[in-house]
From Swiss-Prot:
Protein name, as recorded: Sensor histidine kinase TodS
Native source species: Pseudomonas putida (strain DOT-T1E)
Annotated Histidine kinase domain residues: 187-405, 757-974
Activity control note: Activity is regulated by agonists and antagonists. Binding of agonists such as toluene or benzene to TodS stimulates autophosphorylation at His-190. Activity is inhibited by antagonists such as o-xylene, o-chlorotoluene and trimethylbenzene isomers, which bind to TodS but do not stimulate autophosphorylation. Agonists and antagonists bind to the same PAS domain.
Reaction it catalyzes: ATP + protein L-histidine = ADP + protein N-phospho-L-histidine
Stored CDD domains: HATPase_TutC-TodS-like, HisKA, PAS, REC
Organism superkingdom: Bacteria
Gene: todS
Pfam family, one: PAS_4
4-aspartylphosphate: residues bearing it: D500
Record PTM Phosphohistidine, positions in chain: H190, H760
PROSITE patterns from the UniProt entry: HIS_KIN, PAC, PAS, RESPONSE_REGULATORY
GO molecular function, a single term: ATP binding
Length: 978
């Protein structure tokens, strides 16, 4: 008997193999053979020994059991004839060739399929190799066969390839949808320019006709004109962005004097500088000739100066300089003495829709597109733009532009025709920020018998509108910002405060906070009027500090009704406080006493009665980690499961605190929860949180924390039970990401189908605007002018403009890509928006649409866009089913109501279509199941996903009269903390 000695070859080539020499056996031959056989048969993978001709000598037990054979059956027989290779004749022939190759001295390795599981009845994939073994003379005497089961690996690779393919297809579809969306908005923006021109043109004609007549509606004409110009500016900006996205924005190069262009734009701001007492310094050379797109260069300078004047306080300094940089480059610098831009935000400010918001100086108007467009125009010129700190404080913007156009570009000469005037600045937009007679706080002589209302609004047009609505019933005085309002309130407290949120100097939410801090003002009711539809902020303000929150736009009738309610409550409260003060008490004191009394009644001690033996068994054998800590969160005891989860031993945990195992960003919340628990302010709680392990890794767990029963004289002991959910959380995050992508793709596809309907819905109000504008022109042109009819026409123009703006807002909101955030849903707005979206497709398919909603609906938390997508998916399925069938009655009914117990919202989508068979109902919500000729079959699966995200249920019923009825139940919000 000989032993094997495996050596590595000195030089390896295609035909090299490991050199294994045979040596004489030692004196302990029997023992060594026994050990070798134990090891050989104990190997988990396939191992076999063949002679030089490929006949079987030895095979380990695992390989034999996998094929369902014995060694005696195959010993001495060709290896390729064994059970493993009997999948097919081709497999047998392939194995024979591999043996012949190895017998010639070449190492063989490949992936093959064999009958190697369940007694040779199941095919598995193995990483197979044949290693030639030679004696000392170099002759091949054995072949060592090895195989490693890689079936799971192959399946995983195939699944990964499939998922990658699906992801690539989804990404490509999203890209196409994004391009379609950009094209759609470009078309909508372009179509809006015509009706806006038809608003402004007739309006200018009316104003020209009424210029010398002292029309009582002149102020309203100016408001309409000013805001229509603002809307036109935003439409033009969106059109520019769409062109840049489509790479259709080009440059019209012209040889021009940059000094003259810069000087012309700068001169438009001199009036604003005088009104705000700002030192406006321009340093320009006499002449600097460059090849640029003049219009885009003027837009660059205009936007930079506009930002500087927005953020520079009264009495500040603004500089605009033009100079040569390195050879063949012009350098434009615009600096101000405003609050500056933090380094962390200097990249973000050039992103689209980003607006800088800093304490004490907030951008109250605009879309956040100005600097984004500046950057785009600069890069089109192959230039650069940067921002840094200005000397002495403030922001310093630097723009570098090449003086020469790219080689081969067409450059117009100075004599080529150009528009008559350079860029004209609409300074009215920036004059609103300057202090003048209208913007200063206005206080009228008060009459003692009328309640006082203070209006805080930075926009003069809106301020004047609110004042006109209320001045007939109340004593109204105004302030342009929160700081001035706080000063006025200290001297003359109002009965009602009406404030905007986004204002310069002091914002509305900061004003509310300051008012509530002052005892003498804390009882004043506050109404917030804002165009910022932030549901989270709205709920926070309503729950903590304000009595009403009204979104812009709003009707004058609704404003008067809400103001009347708040003022009446304030007057009644004042009378009650006065009555109670005569008795030596106050409402606030009584309320405080009631709350404290109720809190004491709710406190109780929870007794735990578990035996020591039972506790010990649970403690030591539980799969969940159990930790006992003192009030300082120091670890007293930790069970084996916790030690295994975190990697700390029993000695490692001695003297450690749970805070040392807590990531720093979670530590404040954990401390607060623990303090509430110890102080009796919170009951037993469960929280999902992370822990730091000994090896530096982080795990996620569900932690349940409670107080142990406490004996008299003993310190409190805290029980913490930790359930490791790291793998579950990672899987859930991956699933959530895929679901978010799928929901967004579905929403984009839905909006793509609605493009024609939305365009139709926008055209209707725009056509009405044009008709009413022409009618108003005729009525005002009559002698005498028909003022009442003109007024009604203007009111209809405003109404239809609001309707077009609402449609655009609704589309932007529906397409906005964002993470799922659960927050209070405005059901009234959801019902209105959904009805508006479905109106056109239902009419186009001759389907009668009815939307029914209860007056009082349960309050639910969720993602409003996803809920709207769910309803639209169900409704469009119903419309399509009715359209494809020959239905005598074509009816679709959407209903919104509470359930019998009032703890859930029930949404019903009922149609009179052909209905659903029992066979179809069993698979209805399965992914990729569809009864249509086209489509992926994902619509109802996405509806199910959205419902489950909101902890709701979805099901379908078949009414006796025919058709189908889909029902969705979403639980109402329970408490204020969920």
């Amino acid at each position: 008997m000989s032993s094997l000695d495996r050596k590595k070859p000195q030089n390896r080539s295609k035909n090299n193999y490991y050199n294994i020499c045979l040596k004489e056996k030692g004196s302990e031959e029997l023992t060594c053979e026994e050990h070798a056989r134990i090891i050989f048969d104990g190997l988990y993978e396939f191992v076999g020994l063949l002679d030089a001709h490929g006949n079987v000598l030895e095979v380990n037990q695992v390989a034999l059991e996998g094929a369902g054979i014995t060694l005696e059956e195959i010993r001495g027989k060709p290896f390729w004839k064994a059970r493993w290779w009997q999948i097919s004749k081709k497999t047998e022939a392939t194995q024979k060739r591999l043996v012949e190759t190895a017998s010639s001295g070449e190492f063989v390795r490949c992936d093959v399929e064999i009958l190697g599981k369940s007694g040779g009845r199941e095919v598995i994939a193995v990483d197979f190799s044949l290693l030639p073994i030679c004696n000392e003379e170099g002759s091949i005497v054995y072949l060592l066969a090895e195989g490693r089961n890689i079936t799971d690996k192959k399946k995983a690779e195939a699944m990964l390839a499939l998922k990658n393919q699906e992801l690539e297809q989804s990404v490509e579809r999203i890209r196409k949808l994004d391009n379609a969306k950009s094209d759609f908005f470009a078309k909508v923006s372009h179509e809006l320019r015509t009706p806006l021109s038809l608003i402004l043109g007739p309006l200018e004609a009316v104003m020209a006709a009424e210029a010398g007549r002292e029309s009582p509606y002149w102020k309203q004409f100016e408001v309409i004109q000013r805001n229509a110009m603002t809307l036109l500016k935003q439409v033009n900006t969106l059109l520019d962005l769409a062109k840049m996205d489509a790479r259709q924005m080009g440059l019209s190069y012209r040889r021009a004097n940059l000094s003259q262009l810069t000087r012309t734009i700068s001169s438009n701001f001199e009036g604003i500088a005088q009104q705000k007492s700002i030192t406006f310094d321009t340093k320009l050379p006499v002449q600097m000739v460059a090849e640029v797109d003049c219009e885009k260069y003027e837009r660059i300078i205009l936007n930079l100066l506009s930002n500087a004047f927005k953020f520079t306080p009264d009495g500040g300094l603004i500089r605009c300089c033009l100079s040569l940089s390195r050879p063949n480059y012009a350098l434009v610098t615009v600096s101000d003495s405003g609050p500056g831009i933090p380094p962390a935000l200097r990249k973000e400010i050039f992103e689209r829709f980003h607006q800088l918001s800093q304490e004490g100086q907030q951008a109250t108007r605009g879309t956040g597109l100005g600097l984004s467009i500046v950057k785009e125009f600069v890069e089109l010129h192959r230039g650069t733009i940067s921002v840094s700190d200005a000397p002495g404080g403030g922001a310093l913007f630097q723009v570098k532009l090449p003086l020469n156009a790219p080689e081969g570009a067409y450059v117009a000469s100075n004599t080529a025709p150009r528009r008559d005037n350079p860029q004209v600045v609409d300074t009215d937009e920036y004059l609103l920020l300057a202090p003048n007679a209208e913007n200063e706080a206005e206080v009228l002589p008060f009459q003692s018998d009328q309640p006082r209302v203070l209006i805080v609004e930075d926009n003069p047009d809106m301020r004047g509108f609110i004042k006109d609505c209320l001045s007939s019933d109340y004593q109204v005085y105004v302030a342009p910002d929160g700081a001035k309002a706080l000063e006025l309130m200290s001297n003359m407290p109002p009965d009602l405060l009406i404030t905007d949120l986004m204002m310069p100097v002091m914002s509305g939410d900061m004003l509310v906070h300051q008012v509530r801090k002052k005892n003498e003002l804390s009882h004043i009711p506050i109404m917030v009027l804002s165009a910022k539809s932030d549901a989270e902020l709205r709920v926070k303000l309503l729950s903590e500090s304000v009595q009403d929150f009204l979104l812009k736009p709003f009707s004058a009738h609704e404003l008067r009704a809400r103001v009347s309610n708040l003022v009446s409550m304030k007057v009644a409260g004042d009378a009650l406080r006065k009555e109670l003060s005569d008795q030596g008490d106050d409402i606030a004191i009584l309320t405080h006493r009631l709350i404290k009394s109720r809190h004491r009644l709710q406190q109780s001690n929870i007794a735990l009665s578990a035996s020591e033996a039972r506790w010990k068994a649970v403690y030591e054998n539980s799969a969940a980690g159990i930790v006992l800590t003192d009030p300082e969160n120091r670890i007293l005891n930790a069970n084996p499961a916790f030690q295994r989860i975190t990697g700390y031993g029993e000695k490692d945990l001695e003297g450690l605190s749970m805070e040392q195992l807590t990531p720093s960003d979670e530590s404040p919340q954990i401390k607060q929860r623990l303090a509430n628990l110890l102080q009796g302010g919170g009951a037993e709680y469960s929280v999902e949180r992370s822990y730091l392990c000994k090896n530096g890794s982080t795990i996620w767990a569900n932690a349940s924390v409670s107080l142990m029963p406490q004996r008299v004289g003993e310190s409190p002991v805290i029980l913490q039970i930790i359930d490791d959910i790291t793998e579950k959380k990672q899987a859930q995050e991956n699933l959530n990401q895929l679901q978010q992508q799928l929901v967004y793709v579905s929403r984009s596809a839905t909006m793509g189908e609605f493009a024609a309907y939305i365009a139709h819905e926008i055209n209707q109000p725009l056509s009405a605007i044009m008709t009413n504008a022409n009618a108003g022109t005729r009525w005002l042109g009559n002698e005498p002018s028909n003022i009442p009819e003109a007024k009604e026409a203007l009111a209809r123009i405003i109404r239809d403009s609001d309707r077009a703006a609402e449609i655009i807002r609704m589309v932007r909101s529906f397409l906005k890509r964002q993470e799922t955030v659960l927050k209070p849903i405005d059901l009234k707005a959801l019902v209105t928006d959904t009805s508006l979206i479905l109106k056109a497709p239902s009419q186009n398919n001759s389907v009668n649409l009815d939307v029914v909603a209860d007056d009082e609906l349960p309050e639910i938390w969720g993602d409003g866009v996803q809920i709207q997508q769910l309803i639209i998916n169900l409704a469009m399925n119903a419309i399509e089913a009715i359209s494809q069938a020959d239905c005598e009655t074509r009816q679709l009914t959407l209903s919104f109501s509470g359930n019998d117990t009032g703890d859930a919202l029930v949404i019903s989508v009922k149609d009179t279509g052909p209905g659903i068979s029992e066979r179809q109902m069993a698979q209805l919500f399965n992914a990729f199941y569809t009864t249509k000729k086209e489509g992926l079959g994902m619509g109802l699966a996405i509806c199910l996903t959205i419902t489950e995200v909101h902890n709701g249920k979805i099901w379908v019923e078949c009414p006796p009269a025919g058709g189908a009825c889909f029902l969705v139940s979403i639980p109402a919000r329970q408490g204020s903390g969920t």
